[in-house]
């Protein structure tokens, strides 16, 4: 193909498209040099610790984990003994209950590496050449710009997992957000109690209760598995987990699929001990001791996220995933998953600003555009929220706003407020009775927030303080959504100032939450009209042909969760396309095949490429004639290669449908067949009719808007539509375990004639005083929990208790290594109790 490109006419066309010049081979200009990261100066614990100390970042005195002891699974999980007998669970589990201990270490892979660039993260040069070839074969007006953008993306981006320097600099940046120009503030410091936050969340994240069949929050995790040996009746109510994801501490280097039994043993033991703390003479001290014994359940592995990073920032910006210990993830998910799975309520189907559960397909993006046009016609402000993303339409201008390093703005009290909302609105029956017991209320309100917010992380052999919440924990989305809700509520209170104004930016200091304006689209009405008027007359979703439009449809670039909207003449509605910047980056750099089990199959790499090219076409490549033509050619070519190998293409690809990086966005959409216009019709045709005025109100506080609730909270006039029983129940979750026991009488219902808190009797007023006292105890208990989960800063790097650190570039297994065992340690009370219980189980 090089000879074709270097013919005088073609060479001139290519150089003209790239806006470059050369006297030599055109491919020297067309194909950027492979990026090789610089040598990482912080790839050893000594260098990393010195760097962190220089920047006054908190390094914790290391804690050791008891060595693993092998025990019988049926003794540790007696209710699941039948699963062991039937081979559903392994016979032995390894739990940290030894009499010696080790210091954990975690060395993640960083690829590409300076010493070995390898093939991981390599750009798709073959597709780049195909784009160039079809540029020469066709006269697409936007072809030269597309080729230039893809080539520039290859030259300036790099897919990979960053570097130690990038990870450590990210930690510093997170700390800077939390403690810098706008130090973090708790909801109460901003002016919101947990109950007031719950009222706001009723508007911004409406929810449905769990299914009636879902077990209450009263059980240890292993009790959520109902096993009889009959597949027709067997049932597991455990939250869904990704089996191939990391198990976290204390099982470094293993996956969740490898350690399911171990996670159940530890989670059961932890929640059981927490329950016993409730009935002890000193519940606070007992709970603190439990947290100390299980300290590793609050320490996440600092995992570098694979992304398309900017080459120039390779050593400055690596996104960190706080890889939670499996038992911690399991317990938190038991609180959140049963509810969120039933609560896909968003602005397209409910009167709420929430975008949770939103899909741009099947008319989703058109519903958004309909709502936007309705507000433009009525000259009304519009706001939407999804996690740390806020979208505002005001004065014919569209604003896309992101919380700056959203997780860094979180405090334990933010998560406590979210837990309060979960318990009082979700895990509660219609009659006001709770679907949880004191143990789970304590875990949710007292322990859980301290385990994942302002907790600790492990990188190399360094145990470090984390600022804000760990990214990727089971409550990351929920906590971010709550913080965005606070920003929007304060925006309403301030009179809805223009997002580009000083008054709007002053909300940062008021809320303690940093944010930035990512996009401003002025004169949105004209942009929408132009998109409709200039929509393509030919090609996909226009005349019904199986060809791309010669000129792409003009996109309304909302940046709505990464999606834009283009108008389809055939459907007479807007359809989604991926934001152009994201699309170009996806074309330039494949993420590669990461599923190890599928990677071993013959034809695996070819299958991945087929799915990749079909996904590129479906998410918006179909609207770009050059990308669509090249991706279609590549997909068909790879299919032929599979057929030559004698593999049934359609059946083989069924397992690969979720292998695309857009699997979450394309849920329920097949990538196994070549894309046609009918494919686009099938995935974009609305499943139901939509009338913006027919959207039902939120399940709670019907008839209220976020603005009205905010105003009512500010003025103090808001009345809860539920009875005083609800009021008392709401307060119940504020209690520490000891207060639940000592002041249980404060939770009896109000008189049946009383409908509102304000109408309650003197008895209720007295009870409220007790509850306020309990709330003060809870505030201090959050601090106690954090103290139980960390130690004071160490003035020196770990030395003498671990072997010399391995070079992660040359070690046989650089991902995981254990340090030398420390001195003997006494058995903890938990270990002693577990041993007695298991011995009793054996005798029985």
From Swiss-Prot:
Keywords: Covalent protein-RNA linkage, GTP-binding, Nucleotide-binding, Nucleotidyltransferase, Phosphoprotein, RNA-directed RNA polymerase, Transferase, Viral RNA replication, Virion. GO terms for molecular function: GTP binding; RNA-directed RNA polymerase activity. Coiled coil: none annotated. Residues 833-844 have a biased composition (Basic residues). It is found in: Virion. Signal peptide: none annotated. It catalyses: RNA(n) + a ribonucleoside 5'-triphosphate = RNA(n+1) + diphosphate. GO terms for cellular component: virion component. Its EC number is 2.7.7.48. It is an enzyme of class 2 (transferase). Residues 820-844 are annotated as: Disordered. Pfam families: Birna_RdRp_C, Birna_RdRp_palm, Birna_VP1_thumb. One of its GO terms (biological process) is viral genome replication. Exists in multiple phosphorylated forms. GTP binds at residues 248-255. Disulfide bonds: none annotated. Its main location: virion. RNA-dependent RNA polymerase which is found both free and covalently attached to the genomic RNA. May also contain guanylyl and methyl transferase activities. Interacts with VP3 in the cytoplasm. This is RNA-directed RNA polymerase. It comes from Infectious pancreatic necrosis virus (strain Sp).
């Amino acid at each position: 193909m090089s000879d074709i490109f270097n013919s005088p006419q073609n060479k001139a066309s290519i150089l003209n498209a790239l806006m470059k010049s050369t006297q030599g081979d055109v491919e020297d200009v067309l194909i950027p040099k492979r990026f090789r990261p610089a040598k990482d100066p912080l790839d050893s614990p000594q260098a990393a610790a010195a760097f962190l100390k220089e920047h006054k970042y908190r390094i914790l005195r290391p804690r050791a984990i008891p060595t693993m002891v092998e025990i019988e699974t049926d003794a540790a999980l007696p209710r699941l003994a039948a699963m062991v007998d039937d081979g559903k669970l392994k016979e032995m589990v390894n739990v940290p209950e030894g009499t010696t201990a080790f210091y954990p270490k975690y060395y993640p892979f960083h690829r590409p590496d300076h010493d070995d660039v390898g093939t991981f993260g390599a750009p798709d040069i073959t597709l780049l050449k195909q784009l160039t070839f079809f540029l020469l074969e066709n006269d697409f007006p936007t072809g030269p710009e597309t080729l230039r953008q893809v080539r520039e993306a290859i030259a300036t981006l790099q897919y990979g997992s960053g570097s130690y320097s990038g990870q450590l600099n990210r930690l510093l940046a997170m700390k800077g957000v939390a403690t810098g120009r706008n130090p973090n503030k708790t909801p109460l410091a901003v002016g919101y109690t947990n109950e007031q936050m719950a009222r706001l969340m009723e508007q911004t994240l409406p929810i449905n209760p769990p299914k009636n069949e879902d077990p209450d929050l009263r059980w240890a995790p292993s009790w959520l598995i109902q096993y009889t040996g009959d597949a027709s009746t067997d049932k597991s109510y455990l939250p869904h987990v990704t089996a191939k994801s990391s198990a976290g501490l204390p099982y470094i280097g293993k996956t969740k699929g490898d350690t399911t039994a171990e996670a159940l043993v530890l989670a059961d033991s932890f929640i059981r001990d927490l329950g016993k703390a409730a009935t002890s003479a000193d519940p606070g001290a007992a709970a603190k001791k439990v947290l100390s014994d299980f300290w590793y359940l609050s320490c996440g592995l600092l995992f570098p996220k694979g992304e398309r990073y900017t080459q120039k920032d390779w050593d400055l910006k690596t996104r960190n995933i706080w890889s939670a210990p499996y038992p911690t993830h399991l317990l938190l998910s038991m609180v959140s998953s049963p509810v969120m799975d039933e609560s896909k309520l968003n602005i397209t189907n409910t009167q709420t600003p929430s975008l949770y559960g939103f899909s741009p397909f099947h008319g989703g993006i058109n519903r958004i555009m309909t709502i936007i046009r309705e507000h433009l016609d009525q000259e009304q402000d519009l706001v939407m929220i999804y996690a740390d993303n806020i979208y505002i339409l005001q004065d014919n201008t569209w604003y896309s706003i992101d919380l700056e390093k959203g997780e860094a703005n979180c405090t334990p009290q933010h998560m406590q407020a979210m837990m309060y909302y979960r318990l009082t609105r979700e895990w509660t029956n219609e009659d006001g009775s709770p679907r949880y017991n004191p143990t789970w209320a304590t875990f949710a309100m007292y322990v859980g927030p301290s385990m994942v917010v302002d907790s600790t992380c492990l990188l190399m052999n360094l145990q470090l303080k984390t600022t804000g919440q760990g990214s990727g924990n089971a409550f990351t989305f929920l906590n971010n959504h709550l913080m965005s809700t606070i920003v929007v509520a304060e925006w309403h209170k301030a009179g809805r100032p223009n997002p580009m104004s000083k008054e709007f930016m002053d909300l940062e200091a008021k809320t303690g939450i940093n944010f930035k304006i990512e996009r401003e689209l002025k004169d949105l009405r004209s942009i929408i009209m132009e998109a409709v008027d200039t929509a393509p007359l030919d090609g996909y979703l226009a005349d019904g042909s199986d060809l791309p439009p010669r000129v792409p449809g003009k996109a309304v670039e909302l940046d709505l969760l990464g999606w834009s909207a283009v108008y389809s003449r055939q459907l007479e509605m807007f359809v989604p396309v991926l934001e152009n910047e994201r699309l170009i980056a996806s074309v330039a750099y494949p993420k590669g095949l990461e599923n190890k089990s599928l990677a071993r199959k013959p034809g695996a790499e070819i299958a991945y490429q087929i799915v990749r090219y079909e996904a590129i076409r479906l998410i918006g490549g179909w609207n770009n004639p050059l990308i669509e033509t090249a991706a279609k050619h590549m997909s068909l070519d790879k299919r032929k290669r599979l057929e030559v190998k004698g593999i049934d293409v359609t059946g083989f690809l069924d397992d690969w449908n979720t292998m695309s990086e857009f699997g979450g966005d394309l849920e329920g959409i097949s990538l196994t067949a070549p894309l046609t216009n009918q494919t686009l019709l099938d995935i974009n045709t609305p499943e139901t009719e939509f009338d913006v005025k027919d959207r039902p109100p939120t399940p709670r506080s019907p008839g209220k808007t976020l603005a009205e609730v905010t105003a009512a909270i500010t003025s103090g006039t808001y009345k809860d539509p539920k009875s005083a029983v609800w009021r008392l129940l709401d307060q119940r979750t504020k209690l520490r375990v000891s207060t639940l026991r000592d002041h249980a009488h404060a939770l009896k219902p109000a008189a049946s004639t009383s409908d509102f808190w304000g109408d309650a009797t003197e008895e209720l007023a007295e009870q409220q005083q007790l509850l306020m006292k309990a709330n003060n105890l809870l505030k201090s208990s959050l601090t106690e929990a954090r103290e139980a989960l960390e130690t004071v800063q160490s003035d020196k790097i770990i030395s003498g208790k671990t072997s010399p650190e391995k070079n992660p570039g040359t070690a046989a297994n650089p991902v995981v290594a254990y340090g030398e065992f420390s001195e003997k340690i006494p058995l903890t009370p938990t270990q002693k109790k577990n041993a007695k219980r298991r011995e009793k189980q054996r005798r029985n």
